[in-house]
Each structure stands twice: as C-alpha cells, then as structure tokens.
Amino acid sequence: MLILTRRVGETLMIGDEVTVTVLGVKGNQVRIGVNAPKEVSVHREEIYQRIQSEKAGNSSEGGNF
C-alpha cells in the first residue's frame, strides 16, 4: 500500500485520468473529491461491496422466470 501525506487543496493522480483532491479535514473525517472519466466507477467501499454481493446474488439465481 502506498501511503501519502497531502494537505487540503493538494491532489494526487491515479494513472493519467483520475485525480483525488483533499477538500477538507474535520476531526477524524477527510473530505475528498474524485475526478474520473464516466466509464470509471467510483464508490465508497461499503457501497461497492453491496453492489458486488447483489451481483453475486443475482447471478446465483440462474434466471428462473
């Protein structure tokens, strides 16, 4: 895992097209902004895991109609 230190307003690049900017820090929360092309999905981890489990549940149903 790469660990970086950034200040508010500073940005990091992921590849050529994705930027992550630190927007603010308040207590133990960090607000970040992600700028990515439309074809790149960006989700919070808990939302991504829910999407993946729903996909797994739908594919295991086998399409019985």
Curated annotation (Swiss-Prot):
Protein's organism: Shewanella woodyi (strain ATCC 51908 / MS32)
Record has Repressor as a keyword: yes
CC per GO annotation: cytosol
One of the Pfam families matching this protein, by short name: CsrA
NCBIfam families hit by this protein: csrA (TIGR00202), PRK01712.1 (NF002469)
Biological process terms in GO annotation: mRNA catabolic process; negative regulation of translational initiation; positive regulation of translational initiation; regulation of carbohydrate metabolic process
Main localization of the protein described in the UniProt heading: cytoplasm
Listed HAMAP family: CsrA (MF_00167)
Self-association state and partner proteins as the record states: Homodimer; the beta-strands of each monomer intercalate to form a hydrophobic core, while the alpha-helices form wings that extend away from the core.
Annotated protein name in UniProt: Translational regulator CsrA
Molecular-function GO terms, alphabetical: mRNA 5'-UTR binding
The family this protein is said to belong to: Belongs to the CsrA/RsmA family.
UniProt keyword list: Activator, Cytoplasm, Repressor, RNA-binding, Translation regulation
Function per UniProt: A key translational regulator that binds mRNA to regulate translation initiation and/or mRNA stability. Mediates global changes in gene expression, shifting from rapid growth to stress survival by linking envelope stress, the stringent response and the catabolite repression systems. Usually binds in the 5'-UTR; binding at or near the Shine-Dalgarno sequence prevents ribosome-binding, repressing translation, binding elsewhere in the 5'-UTR can activate translation and/or stabilize the mRNA. Its function is antagonized by small RNA(s).
Localization of this protein: Cytoplasm
